[in-house]
Amino acid sequence: ALDDGMDGLQLSSIASGRREKAEAFLTTLNTPIEIMSIEEVAESCEIVVDCAPKVVFAEIANATISRGKILVTVSGAGILANPDIEKQAVEKKARVILATGALLGLDAVRAAAEGTINSVKMVTRKPPNALQGAPHIVENNITLEGLNGATCVFKGSAREGAAAFPANVNVAAALGLAGIGADLTQ
């Protein structure tokens, strides 16, 4: 959508851990842009949109925040794993915006959190192949092959879930951040 034109916004560059993938993506765009390092993107842009895996969240966040820029991220798990992000953003007059995407009603949860919420429980369902390689699956020797019905593979807090399934629980992390906290959200 941004490539098609949005008033006041321009897609100017991308960063990627895999240059060949980024180059292939560039061929789909209407407007030519540059492939840059994370540092270069953060330096040249006013708003950095992060859709990268959690493993590079801290690098992207630090590069953006240290320059007092705006970071829009989908990585609730990355925010939970880097608790100093909010403090750093305040100190540098930067902003961190968690794009909540798949979680309808998050504004209602935020509003309710101004009052009293006694408990928040979230049930997440994922296809087994989406969980392959997740730390919790590997560490607990959970076999995903042959699963053909709903099976509980994890119970815990949103914070624990973010560590156990860093690529799969950004929605739960966002719910925890918006509501009663990542440690109390189940």
Report the location of each language-model feature.
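Short glycine/serine/threonine-rich phosphate/pyrophosphate-binding segments
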Residues: 1, 51, 55-59, 81-82, ...
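Short active-site oxyanion
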Residues: 10-13, 46, 94-96
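Receiver (REC) domain switch-region micro-motif
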Residues: 14, 48, 185
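Beta-loop-alpha module in the N-terminal Rossmann-like domain of NAD(P)-dependent dehydrogenases
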Residues: 33-66, 78-79
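Rossmann-fold NAD(P)-binding glycine/threonine-rich loop
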Residues: 59-62, 67, 75-95, 100
